[in-house]
């Protein structure tokens, strides 16, 4: 009886601990309603092979990372000839000649020798109905990114870090890739030292996506601007994409933070853009951006290319138009030692009607809140 009682008590403690593991909070914005792996029993991968298997199988899963999974040298290296479109100084990124990119797009760039890790070039496939969460500040994937593609849906990634993917090499790999997917919530994720894009949404529809409370850390020894500021931040290049960006910390970048085009509707709200040496936004043809309640601090150029449409709430009075489409007024953005933008296109705001819309708070409280809460370990 005594042993039975002890066993029962231990089992109860374990069950309570397991029940406590799961996603924190719920998605806001376009991906509202995503459930990921739901109430599936959590699994704890121990090896990189186990992690790849769990992420790519057909089961609904809650996958908990308790350590760093280092893929860096897991697939060997490739040596070859690339090119140096941005110069040959030690702080400049160089390009892998992927699909003859150097010949086709940079034929005048000097040739250089390259040696990169194969694991970084293509991310781990994440299939439908998955929650990938980190425990505390310890869950990380190093040397390889994540790919949510080919019809995958209902996925949550929360409280992890994705880092160190061939940082010297353009075309060396992306941190998080979405293409042809739906209902994806990425929250409290830190990305750092990435070869190409921290986030890239490809040319197929990515439907409902929420990127919230993430830390895009652009500090790097190598960059396309040769100044330690990473150029390739966030690239939203989809087809009928709906993207919410809220509460993110975009730091120390020099461009594409974000680049938006090709029939993408972006709601960019309450983000903190800090120390950007080049430009934050590029809005290409087919990019539709509502930007409200954001803070731009030490951003040289807030908007560079402008070929799409944007409403950036140029005044409090102007923000009243949003009540017709969002059910509330939009709030103005804040700027400090920074360029500004004051785009006033409202023709696309009707596209927000009937959709799940993130709330917005005044920009005055955004910077301190985002710095304290964004990224891994800040749930």
Swiss-Prot record:
Recorded consequence of changing residue 233 to A: In strain: 4M-147
Consequence of changing residue 268 to A: In strain: 4M-147
Superkingdom assignment: Eukaryota
Keyword set includes Cell wall biogenesis/degradation: yes
Pfam families, per the entry: Pectate_lyase_4 (PF00544)
Sorted UniProt keywords: Carbohydrate metabolism, Cell wall biogenesis/degradation, Disulfide bond, Glycoprotein, Lyase, Polysaccharide degradation, Secreted, Signal
Posttranslational modification: N-glycosylated at Asn-129 and O-glycosylated at Thr-88 when expressed in Aspergillus nidulans. The protein from strain 4M-147 is O-glycosylated at Thr-88 and Ser-368. PubMed:9195887 modeled GalNAc at the O-glycosylation site, a glycosylation not observed in fungi. The O-linked saccharide is probably mannose.
Disulphide bonds in the chain: 83-102, 92-226, 322-330
Broad class of the protein's primary localization: secreted
Annotated localization: Secreted
Biological processes annotated in GO: cell wall organization; polysaccharide catabolic process
GO molecular function: pectate lyase activity; pectin lyase activity
Impact reported for residue 39 to S: In strain: 4M-147
Reaction(s) this enzyme catalyzes, per UniProt: Eliminative cleavage of (1->4)-alpha-D-galacturonan methyl ester to give oligosaccharides with 4-deoxy-6-O-methyl-alpha-D-galact-4-enuronosyl groups at their non-reducing ends
The keyword Cell wall biogenesis/degradation is assigned to this record: yes
PANTHER family: PECTATE LYASE 18-RELATED, PECTIN LYASE A-RELATED
Entry similarity comment: Belongs to the polysaccharide lyase 1 family.
Record's protein name: Pectin lyase A
Biological classification of the source: Eukaryota, Fungi, Dikarya, Ascomycota, Pezizomycotina
């Amino acid at each position: 009886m005594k042993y039975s009682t002890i066993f029962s008590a231990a089992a109860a403690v374990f069950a309570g601990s397991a029940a406590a593991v799961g996603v924190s909070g719920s998605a806001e914005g376009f991906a509202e309603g995503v459930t990921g792996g739901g109430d599936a029993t959590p699994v704890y991968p121990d090896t990189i092979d186990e992690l790849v298997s769990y992420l790519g199988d057909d089961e609904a899963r809650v996958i908990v990372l308790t350590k760093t999974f280092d893929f860096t040298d897991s697939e060997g290296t490739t040596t070859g000839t690339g090119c140096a479109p941005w110069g040959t100084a030690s702080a400049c990124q160089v390009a892998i000649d992927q699909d003859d990119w150097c010949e086709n797009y940079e034929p005048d760039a000097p040739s250089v020798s390259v040696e990169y890790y194969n694991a970084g070039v293509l991310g781990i496939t994440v299939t439908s109905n998955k929650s990938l969460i980190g425990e505390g500040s310890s869950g990380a994937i190093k040397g390889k990114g994540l790919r949510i593609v080919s019809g995958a849906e209902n996925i949550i990634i929360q409280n992890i870090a994705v880092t160190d993917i061939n940082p010297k090499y353009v075309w060396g790999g992306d941190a998080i890739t979405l293409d042809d997917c739906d209902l994806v919530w990425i929250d409290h994720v830190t990305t750092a030292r990435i070869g190409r894009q921290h986030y890239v949404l490809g040319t197929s529809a990515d439907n409902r996506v929420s990127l919230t409370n993430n830390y895009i850390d652009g500090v790097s020894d190598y960059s396309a601007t040769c100044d330690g500021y990473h150029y390739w931040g966030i690239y939203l290049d989809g087809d009928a994409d709906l993207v919410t960006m809220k509460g993110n910390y975009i730091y120390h970048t020099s461009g594409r933070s974000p680049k938006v085009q090709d029939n993408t509707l972006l709601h960019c709200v309450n983000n903190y853009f800090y120390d950007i040496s080049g430009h934050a936004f590029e809005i290409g043809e087919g990019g539709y951006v509502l930007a409200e309640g954001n803070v731009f601090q030490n951003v040289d150029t807030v908007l560079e290319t402008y070929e799409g449409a944007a409403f950036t709430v140029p005044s409090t009075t102007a923000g009243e138009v949003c009540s017709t489409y969002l059910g509330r007024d939009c709030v103005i953005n804040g700027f400090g030692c920074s360029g500004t933008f004051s785009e006033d296109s409202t023709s696309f705001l009707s596209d927000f009607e009937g959709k799940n819309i993130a709330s917005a708070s005044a920009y005055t409280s955004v910077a301190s809140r985002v710095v304290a809460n964004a990224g891994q370990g800040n749930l």
